[in-house]
Amino acid sequence: DTCVSDRLNRAPSVFFLKCLQPYIHYVMSQYIINAPFLLIFPVRNRLREIVGASTNWKDHQQALAERASLSQYLAQSQDELPAKTMKDSAVEAHLPLGSQPALREKYLNYHNSVRFGRILEDLDSLAVLICYSHTWNKELKRSPLSIVTALVDKIDMRKNIIYPDCDIKFTGHVTWVGKTSIEAKMHVSQYHDGAYTDVLDATFVMVARDPENKRAAFINPLKLESPEEEAIFQQGEINKTRRVELSTASLLKVAPTAEERTRIHNLFLNTLDTQTVSFRSRILPPNSVWMEDAKMKGLEICHPQERNIFNRIFGGFLMRKAYELGWANACAFVGSRPTLVAVDDIIFRKPVEIGSLLLLSSQVCYTEGMHIQVRVHTEVLDPLTRQHSTTNVFHFTFCIEKDIPAVVPQSYGESMLYLDGKRHFDETMRSQG
């Protein structure tokens, strides 16, 4: 208790985060005792029922028109809505890979492990359900809110192997609430050798919109019932402040720090040809790869099959495709199978419409020791107008048990990608201690 209370009003620290983690798991375990139990694969069907989404693509326009009438049930201020507790949103879902072998095909990869991209899809669906549980009004048959994923704050892996023949348990609840945004934390564990062991911890931030997904909508405030809950809520405030600070210091807005400029200049000097004494003649240092040669690209046609309950492309699908491309990029870069360490700072900047062409571009941005930092940029191309729009930027940290070549930028733009990758890598290492 002293560990948490002494630090509630201080700047975020690795010590605080590690100290708080057992509280989050303890609180979550207490809530799950009375939480609704469900299997993971019907979650998306449950979400369709909550919002009244169509099950057939041909009926989606009618379903959207019917949802528009729900605007009359939106609150005009947050004060109109009853406060909810963390217990109200607690959800437990199971993926019975051990007890139902027929499910394994969807989740199995070539290496006889679980496809992590599928886990990302399940996390995204569950986060939305958790938030709808928080805002649920039993007087209404359908929710007037459109709750969508705004960002993935962090996913930290707790183990390297996810077994394809052992049951997986997802638990989670709301941990922080603003006026129109809401944070949900989830914990994934797997039953192996007679006990559940930690797999990952994830933090998602969702936003509430009106039934037509055109403007923000108010959500129920959060009622805190214990010092442990106050500590968890305070961590949500810290997360929000950290995101604002990182956005303010973005290399897209401000110049690199003096230390970062020195690092880039030293990288540049290491690539100069000492025989010519010229700024134009560049040579690749030993055990290095030009950033230009550490890329991989992909294309997806956005079909209705991958739509979410609001008839845009499902965010979990985007995360899965980005992860798989980033993994392939890291694998090809080093010639060995990489292990995921963390996912962080995924921002959903713009929804992806059905029929769009989704362009994915992966880049190895930074390497250090046995770690690789990969950035995946996604954009949509409207084939009729030929306009490009960025939808997401994903950041993945991988680990490989072998020597990894350094990645070397040549242009100023590549240098900024290098520094941004280092920032994300350093943040991941700090959060994991």
Q: Can you annotate each of these PLM segments?
A:
Residues 1-46:
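N-terminal mitochondrial targeting presequence
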Residues 30-72, 161-256, 354, 365-433:
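HotDog/MaoC-like acyl-thioester-processing domains
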Residues 112, 116-119, 131-149, 161-163, ...:
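Single-stranded nucleic-acid-binding OB-fold domains
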